[in-house]
Design a protein with these regions (language model features):
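Iron-sulfur cluster-binding cysteine motifs and their immediate structural context
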Residues: 14-34, 38, 51-68
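FAD-site-proximal beta/loop scaffold in flavoenzymes
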Residues: 16, 33, 216-235, 387-447
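Glycine-rich dinucleotide-binding loop and its adjacent helix/turn
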Residues: 75-98, 206-284, 419-429
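N-terminal Rossmann-like FAD-binding beta1-loop-alpha1 element of flavoenzymes
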Residues: 108-130, 255-262
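Dinucleotide-binding/catalytic capping subdomain of oxidoreductase cores
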Residues: 142, 260-385
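N-terminal Rossmann-like dinucleotide/flavin-binding domain of flavoprotein oxidoreductases
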Residues: 142-196, 341-357, 362
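Glycine-/small-residue-rich beta->alpha transition segments that form the dinucleotide
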Residues: 195-196, 200-207, 221-224, 251-253, ...
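C-terminal, flexible cofactor-proximal segment of oxidoreductases
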Residues: 427-494
């Protein structure tokens, strides 16, 4: 009996290297990697050894015979991925680090940030060099989005933090927490002190919405920080008093997280890492309906299939779809692997009706937000049957979950159009695309706010490969002797 990869797959790919028969795909060398919700196990080739389950940092791999009824679909999804793919999975040529440890001149490296991208970068550096790594983070505790961006009821995904715990106490790692680069220490000071600096600062701003109203929606980023206990988000940042209907603009995974948390039975959240103030507010919450609003159709929904499936499978809160027969036909025609495929069996909803008072989640597609006004969100149809038709959705609270972008760090080149650190494949470059000596970037700050936790592993490893290549070729112009340097914060320590 084979194993199957389930909902909370992080695409970390730790399972790939331990599989003795190469039956887990797509691999980082294959075109589909980073484009699928999950990695998939070929049930025809799996030898049932369980090595992948032991290696998975988020417990996403389970023996098919032990899948719960709600997880049974993942046996089918794993098998479906290989339906038109070869059974014989050839091994690729082995790859090795580009240099011997002793020949790499990187002795002191700073990593700005402590989220997954930062941690994968440090892991690769510690494995391939003898460099000492210093983490900088403005927050008093490490973890980044793995700590403050993963929903508290996603307990398995949050275990990725445990995966990195040993890294923070590694003998060659120094932690500088509560130190904000650009405020407490400058980019220039880091450049003078370290052989290389890797910026893993993420994306901390919302993408702008072209709304016609002066009223702006609440950022879903604020809601997420509120229920995860982010130090920068006050306990009173979200006020649910008098709120019965919520509209979330956007239909990515963050939107689904917001809808799920706001409608969850409180007993489902007790015992999770949810903040105490959020739990108290949700216990008294009167929210009865959350509408997840998408400008385009379900065939291009931004959420992942696994998150949608989990929402539909939740028996405590019904999921409905607002739309006509045309929408029903579109949903019915979606392939099994499509993000919105689980909605094909969801009942239709009339947004003008509040139902019997029971809590519910409503998906609404093909409607663009126009303006927020007291008690409602004005929208305009963008589908084939209602293009340009204006309407409104009742809403006591409107949330914006339309994606994130980075903000400029003083002294570091910034691409305002993309909302990222200005870079070419991870090398920081100036306005004329010339490499900035010793400066690199990983994660969302490098490629934009796309991809999950595991996507940052391959991203970080590729940037580290560039660092090693630059070190060997002397492309970095800062080969200063460390003996004459003065530490930024006195003696090294944690």
């Amino acid at each position: 009996m084979a194993f199957a990869i389930t909902q909370n797959c992080c695409n970390d790919a730790s399972c790939l290297s331990v599989c003795p028969v190469n039956c887990i795909h797509p691999t980082p060398d294959e075109p589909d990697f980073g484009k699928t919700d999950l990695l998939y196990i070929d049930p025809r080739s799996c030898i049932d050894c369980g090595a992948c389950a032991d290696a998975c940092p988020v417990d996403a791999i389970t023996r098919v015979s032990r899948l719960s009824p709600s997880q049974a679909i993942y046996a089918e999804l794993n098998a479906d991925y290989y339906r038109d793919r070869p059974v014989d999975h050839a091994w690729g040529a082995p790859t090795f680090p580009p240099a011997d440890i002793g020949s790499v001149s990187l002795k002191r490296v700073a990593v700005v940030g402590t989220g997954p991208a930062a941690c994968y970068t440090a892991t690769a550096l510690l494995r391939q060099t003898d460099a000492a790594v210093t983490f900088f983070d403005k927050l008093p505790v490490p973890g980044g989005l793995a700590r403050y961006g993963v929903a508290p009821d996603h307990t398995s995904t949050r275990r990725i933090g445990e995966h990195f715990r040993s890294l923070f106490v590694h003998s060659r790692v120094t932690m500088r927490l509560g130190v904000e680069v650009g405020v407490d220490v400058t980019v220039e000071e880091l450049s003078r002190t370290f052989d290389a600096v890797v910026y893993a600062v993420g994306a901390d701003q919302d993408r702008q919405l072209p709304l016609e109203s002066e009223v702006v929606p609440m950022s879903a980023r604020t809601l997420v920080g509120w229920y995860t206990g982010h130090p920068d988000v006050p306990a009173d940042a979200v006020d649910l008093r008098g709120v019965t209907r919520v509209v979330v603009i956007g239909n990515g995974n963050v939107a689904l997280d917001a809808a799920r948390i706001l409608t969850a039975p409180v007993e489902d959240l007790v015992g999770t890492d949810i903040s105490a103030h959020a739990l108290a507010a949700l216990r008294d919450s009167a929210v009865r309906e959350v509408t997840v609003l998408g400008r385009r159709g379900p065939e291009v929904a931004a959420f992942t299939r696994s998150e949608c499936q989990a929402l539909v499978d939740r028996t405590s809160v019904p999921v409905l779809v607002a739309g006509d027969d045309d929408l029903s036909s579109v949903l019915a025609a979606l392939p099994l692997s499509a993000s919105a495929a689980p909605l094909a069996t969801a009942p239709r909803a009339d947004e003008a009706e509040t139902g019997d008072g029971a809590t519910r989640i409503v998906f609404s597609f093909g409607r663009a937000p126009v303006a927020v006004r007291p008690g409602a969100l004005d929208v305009r149809g963008s589908g084939t049957s209602d293009a340009g038709i204006a309407s409104s959705i009742p809403a006591d609270l409107v949330l914006q979950a339309t994606g994130y972008r980075g903000s400029a760090l003083p002294g570091l080149p910034f691409d305002a159009d993309r909302g990222t650190v200005r870079n070419v494949e991870g090398r920081v470059v100036d306005s004329e695309d010339r490499p900035v000596a010793g400066a690199y970037v990983v994660g969302w700050a490098k490629r934009g706010a796309t991809g999950g936790i595991g996507d940052n592993k391959l991203d970080a490893e590729r940037t580290v490969e560039l660092m090693l290549a630059d070190s060997l070729s002397a492309a970095t112009s800062s080969r200063r002797e460390t003996a004459g340097r003065r530490p930024l914060f006195g003696r090294a320590g944690r």
